[in-house]
Every structure is written in C-alpha cells, then in structure tokens.
Amino acid sequence: MNIIDRFEQENISKRTANKKIPDFEAGDTVKVTVKIIDRSIEKDGKEKLTERFQAYEGVVIAKRNRGITSSFLVRKISHGEGVERRFMTYSPMVHSIDVVKYGVVRRAKLYYLRNRSGKSARIKERHIPIAKTKAAKA
C-alpha cells in the first residue's frame, strides 16, 4: 500500500468514526441529510452563521467508489421537474444517509431514468429478510 492509499484510508476512518454509512447501490431510495450553513448580516454589521439540516430523498442512479472522493448521484422529482444532486460520501457536510427502500435493477448506472416518467420510471422493491436488517442495525 503506498502513502496516498494509506492517507486516504486514515482519512476515511476518521470521517466515518462518528457516523454510519449504510450499504446501498443504484436503484435504492435514500434519504440524505445535509448540513447547510446560512450566513446573514445583522443590523449592527456582525456576521451570523446558522446551521440547519436539510433532507433530500430520491433514487440513487449512480455510485462512484474512489476512496475518499467516493460519491453518489441521487435523482428526485420536485414540482414535476427532475432534480439530480451529487453527494460526496465522506463529506463532513453529509450528516446522515438512510436507506428508505431497496430496489431491484440490472444496471450499475440508471441514467435511462432521466428520459422516463410515470410508471416506466418505477423501480421494483427488493425485500430483505428481517433477520438480515436487524443484524445490520445492531
């Protein structure tokens, strides 16, 4: 293992020490909670920073596993428009990742969903035995 790989592994272990990243793949519906920092200027001219959390729920259409720069692309329909957002898996701005539903797909990248709407864009749900999910949570 070279120096860069070792550095990346140390960095990943530091960032995942206090948060759990579940196993998910393309086709799964996830809920990503992101930390947003708002900057506002008060009347006396002082700058005020406020933190809040925003949830983003959608279908994972692509996943990129590249060490510390791993990311995944989530697509959702908001007010009739398709919205895609890429999240860095190990970013400190990503507060939590929760899997809502597991999907059954036969592709690693689901870019074809961009051209589909309605029933043709649905993904079958994969049912996981209860014992397996309880063991994963423990």
Curated annotation (Swiss-Prot):
* PROSITE patterns given in the database record: RIBOSOMAL_L19
Task: List the GO terms this entry assigns under cellular component, sorted alphabetically.
Answer: cytosolic large ribosomal subunit
| The keyword Repressor appears for this protein | no
Instruction: Name the source's superkingdom.
Output: Bacteria
Q: Which UniProt keywords apply?
A: Ribonucleoprotein, Ribosomal protein
Q: Which GO terms describe its biological process?
A: translation
User: GO MF annotations for this entry?
Assistant: structural constituent of ribosome
Q: Which InterPro entries match?
A: Ribosomal_bL19, Ribosomal_bL19_CS, Ribosomal_bL19_sf, Translation_prot_SH3-like_sf
What does the sequence similarity comment in the record state about its family?
Belongs to the bacterial ribosomal protein bL19 family.
Tell me the function of this protein: This protein is located at the 30S-50S ribosomal subunit interface and may play a role in the structure and function of the aminoacyl-tRNA binding site.
What is the name attached to this protein's record?
A: Large ribosomal subunit protein bL19
Gene source species: Rickettsia conorii (strain ATCC VR-613 / Malish 7)
| This protein's encoding gene | rplS
